[in-house]
């Protein structure tokens, strides 16, 4: 992108606005080098990264990148085996800690299932160096000062220094108290030439002995190191020298530790700077209330409620601006001071921002194009003097632009053809626009020449526009009116300002009829457009309300469906609980019936087996979409004596004897008579076979037909399990203590199914495979409780 367009559209001011949010020197460096890209892939990726940063800022207040210095120079010195100072090593330590923090931060985002579109590829390039980070953290403070923990020798030396200093100060302070005070200029202990001294009056020099290290400017005070502390100061000095040597050794050692990782550290520093810049872009977008620009697939610029980013966002007027698609040339006509130039700059600057990976101050779903170059000839639109030199300057610029245009160019012309004779200027403007269109470039032009209003109507792919003017307030509104050329308001303004009506009438007569007709047409178009915009706004609001109502209804339906599902699941569980209780009750009845063996009469055990099987068939899994128990609605019915019924509680068939009351019947079930609630009865069709009245006892007619072995070989899986269930019931009724189920070896699927069934059957006491000579694991012996 040419530098001139960046200067004309004040692109650097956008970067200055972003600069305030940057924390790292590398981020500042990347911002300084940032320019718009003409590569669509690069732009798309940059916008995706900014989108990630905006979402992170919204959810987590930004990526945790701290203030970091540029360590490039320090890393270069490491490559020649130079030792770094403490501050430089501390800076490297901060980069390593920031690297780990950022990686952990993005791991947390992943765990929280926060979607990251493009930055995950950037984060993958960061590399932690735990051993180096830990060593630096344990050795150096943030200001570069070496910690005592940097080495055991350094700790020992510093402990000695502390002890000796304490001894020296203790001895020296004795000279600042008592009778010695009168020999001092001031009762203090100070330092000269890195040694502890006292300020002795010159006439009492001999009272202290020792060494004189300095003298006051007046010559009346000597800074004396008393003889009694000379040896201690010497020892202190030796330890201080040893401390310096040990610190240098540690710095050399730490530098050698860091040196192999210079390339990794350089990359980490660069990536952290890039993330810092993305943070800044996100914060600037938040400040501007900017949105993500979409790259148009049809090469169309469609900016919705676009605002110039450098104007106070509380005062700036937003505009809808469309360019491309049906028309490639936009001509904004009308008088000056209405905001034409700002509109021109807004389009150009928002394009530069989008192609730099920035969000733009416009409503959502605004679209931009990717231009290879953007050119502009924008002068001082408020200039009163338009002389030949100005015209020549603009023409030189226009000639340069025309020589570089292609189908991937955007040309912005402010007051095209101005500065010369109006007729010649208008003719030149028309010819220049035709030339621009022939190159395939997109262009926006502002002009106050009326001839270009007709051009906007007559040329294919060209559209007129104007800036709205409020004749009531005599002020521009700065709103762009697409499709409507600018109209002159000179007569109306003059009338409102008080110009004599005779003068205005005479002036109107001097204007040709075509111009008057054109102005009247424009006025009518403006009125119609305002009416259409008002209707459209109402339609948009109604659509928004309808969408809100729709969302409310959808949420309501979802809530009802959820409640319905919960109720159904609850009902299924209740139904299955009732069925399980019925099974248990049926088992108890069967046991009681077995005890009637010595009674007279007879009872068919097959009837009991059938009844119990029907109870088992009632059970439904709770996750089924339709529950058979729930689906079977109980129909209203009347009962009569001798009707055959099923007692639902026990799953047994019986015969109605008499009605006890409105809610109860007496029922004969085999040898038992029971009082049963109407709700527990269900009428059934009578058996076609001849019934035999059960009298006082049960005769085991079925036991003789039940074998002690069940052979399932050759059976299908489901069929085998069903037959096993029936067989277990029959064997229990027959009074067997154990039985054998032959399932064969085969693939083991049937054997596994039988084992699972037996484990879950509460009537089974134990089971095991048959002995090797009796079938082995091809048969299972079952023991009943």
From Swiss-Prot:
SUPFAM superfamilies named in the record: DNA repair protein MutS, domain III, P-loop containing nucleoside triphosphate hydrolases, SMR domain-like
The lineage, from the top, is:
Bacteria, Bacillati, Bacillota, Bacilli, Lactobacillales
The answer, when asked if 4Fe-4S is one of the entry's keywords, is no
Q: Which residues bind ATP?
A: 334-341
| Family matches, as InterPro entries | DNA_mismatch_repair_MutS_C, DNA_mismatch_repair_MutS_core, DNA_mismatch_repair_MutS_sf, MSSS, MutS, MutS2, P-loop_NTPase, Smr_dom
Q: Which UniProt keywords apply?
A: ATP-binding, DNA-binding, Endonuclease, Hydrolase, Nuclease, Nucleotide-binding, RNA-binding, rRNA-binding
Residue ranges of domain Smr in the record: 710-785
Supply the name of the protein: Endonuclease MutS2
**Pfam families, sorted:** MSSS, MutS_V, Smr
Highest taxon in the source lineage: Bacteria
Can you provide one Gene Ontology molecular function annotated for this UniProt record?
ATP binding
Q: Cross-referenced Gene3D superfamilies, in alphabetical order? A: 3.30.1370.110, P-loop containing nucleotide triphosphate hydrolases
* Role: Endonuclease that is involved in the suppression of homologous recombination and thus may have a key role in the control of bacterial genetic diversity. Acts as a ribosome collision sensor, splitting the ribosome into its 2 subunits. Detects stalled/collided 70S ribosomes which it binds and splits by an ATP-hydrolysis driven conformational change. Acts upstream of the ribosome quality control system (RQC), a ribosome-associated complex that mediates the extraction of incompletely synthesized nascent chains from stalled ribosomes and their subsequent degradation. Probably generates substrates for RQC.
- Entry annotated with the keyword Transport: no
Enumerate the HAMAP family for this protein.
MutS2
Name the protein family.
Answer: Belongs to the DNA mismatch repair MutS family. MutS2 subfamily.
Q: What is its EC number?
A: 3.1.-.-, 3.6.4.-
Question: Subunit details for this protein?
Answer: Homodimer. Binds to stalled ribosomes, contacting rRNA.
Q: Which GO terms describe its biological process?
A: mismatch repair; negative regulation of DNA recombination; rescue of stalled ribosome
């Amino acid at each position: 992108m040419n530098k001139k367009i960046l200067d004309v559209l004040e692109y650097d001011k956008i970067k200055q606005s972003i600069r305030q949010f940057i924390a790292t020197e590398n981020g500042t460096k990347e911002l300084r080098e940032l320019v718009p890209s003409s590569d669509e892939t690069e732009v798309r990726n940059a916008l995706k990264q900014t989108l990630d940063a905006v979402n992170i800022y919204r959810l987590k207040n930004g990526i945790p990148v701290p203030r970091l210095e540029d360590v490039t120079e320090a890393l270069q010195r490491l490559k020649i085996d130079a030792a770094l100072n403490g501050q430089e090593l501390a800076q490297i330590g901060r980069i390593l800690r920031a690297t780990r923090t950022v990686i952990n931060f993005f791991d947390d985002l992943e765990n929280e299932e926060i979607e990251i579109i493009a930055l995950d590829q950037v984060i993958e390039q960061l590399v932690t160096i735990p051993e180096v980070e830990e060593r630096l953290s344990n050795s150096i403070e943030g200001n570069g000062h070496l910690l005592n923990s940097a080495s055991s020798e350094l700790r020992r030396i510093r402990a000695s220094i502390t002890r000796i200093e304490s001894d020296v100060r203790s001895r020296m302070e004795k000279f600042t108290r008592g009778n010695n005070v009168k020999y001092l200029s001031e009762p203090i202990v100070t330092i000269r030439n890195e040694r502890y001294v006292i300020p002795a009056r010159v006439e009492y020099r001999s009272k202290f002995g020792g060494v004189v290290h300095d003298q006051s400017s007046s010559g009346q005070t000597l800074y004396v190191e008393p003889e009694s502390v000379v040896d201690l100061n010497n020892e202190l000095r030796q330890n201080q020298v040893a401390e310096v040597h040990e610190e240098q050794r540690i710095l050399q050692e730490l530098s050698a530790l860091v040196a192999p990782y210079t390339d990794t550290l350089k990359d980490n520093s660069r990536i952290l700077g890039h993330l810092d810049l993305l943070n800044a872009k996100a914060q600037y977008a938040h400040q501007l209330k900017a949105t993500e620009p979409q790259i148009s697939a049809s090469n169309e610029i469609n900016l919705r409620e676009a605002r110039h980013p450098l104007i106070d966002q509380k005062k700036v007027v937003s505009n809808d601006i469309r360019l491309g698609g049906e028309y490639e040339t936009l001509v904004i006509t009308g008088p000056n001071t209405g905001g034409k130039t700002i509109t021109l700059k807004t389009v150009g600057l928002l394009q530069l921002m989008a192609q730099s990976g920035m969000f733009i101050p416009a409503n959502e779903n605004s679209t931009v194009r990717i231009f290879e170059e953007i050119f502009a000839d924008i002068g001082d639109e408020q200039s009163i003097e338009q002389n030949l030199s100005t015209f020549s300057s603009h023409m030189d610029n226009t000639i340069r632009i025309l020589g570089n245009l292609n189908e991937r160019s955007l040309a912005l012309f402010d007051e095209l053809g101005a500065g010369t004779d109006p007729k010649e200027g208008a003719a030149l403007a028309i010819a220049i626009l035709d030339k621009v269109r022939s190159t395939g470039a997109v262009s926006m032009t502002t002009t106050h020449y009326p001839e270009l209003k007709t051009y906007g109507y007559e040329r294919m792919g060209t559209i007129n526009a104007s800036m709205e003017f409020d004749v009531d307030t005599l002020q521009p509104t700065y709103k762009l009116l697409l499709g409507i050329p600018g109209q002159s308001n000179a007569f109306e303004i003059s009338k409102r300002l008080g110009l004599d009506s005779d003068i205005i009438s005479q002036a109107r007569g001097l204007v040709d009829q075509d111009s008057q007709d054109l102005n009247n047409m424009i006025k009518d178009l403006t009125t119609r457009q305002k009416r259409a915009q008002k209707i459209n706004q109402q339609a948009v609001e109604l659509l928004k309300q309808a969408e809100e109502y729709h969302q409310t209804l959808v949420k309501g339906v979802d809530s009802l469906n959820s409640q319905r599902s919960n109720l159904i699941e609850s009902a299924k569980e209740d139904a299955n609980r009732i069925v399980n209780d019925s099974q248990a009750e049926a088992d108890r009845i069967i046991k009681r019936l077995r005890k009637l063996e010595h009674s007279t009469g007879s009872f068919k055990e097959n009837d009991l087996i059938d009844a119990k099987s029907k109870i088992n068939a009632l059970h439904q899994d709770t996750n089924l979409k339709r529950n058979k128990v729930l689906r079977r609605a109980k129909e209203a019915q009347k009962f009569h004596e001798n009707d055959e019924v099923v007692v639902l509680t026990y799953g047994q068939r019986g015969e109605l004897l008499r009605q006890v009351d409105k809610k109860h019947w007496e029922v004969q079930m085999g040898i038992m008579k029971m009082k049963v609630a109407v709700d527990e009865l269900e009428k059934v069709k009578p058996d076609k076979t001849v019934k035999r009245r059960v009298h006082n006892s049960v005769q085991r007619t079925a036991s003789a037909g039940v074998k002690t072995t069940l052979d399932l070989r050759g059976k299908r899986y489901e069929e085998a399990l069903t037959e096993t269930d029936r067989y277990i019931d029959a064997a229990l009724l027959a009074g067997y203590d154990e039985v054998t189920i032959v399932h064969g070896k085969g693939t083991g699927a049937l054997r596994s199914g039988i084992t699972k069934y037996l484990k879950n059957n509460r009537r089974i006491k134990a089971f095991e495979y048959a002995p090797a000579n009796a079938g082995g694991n091809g048969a299972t012996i079952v023991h009943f409780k």
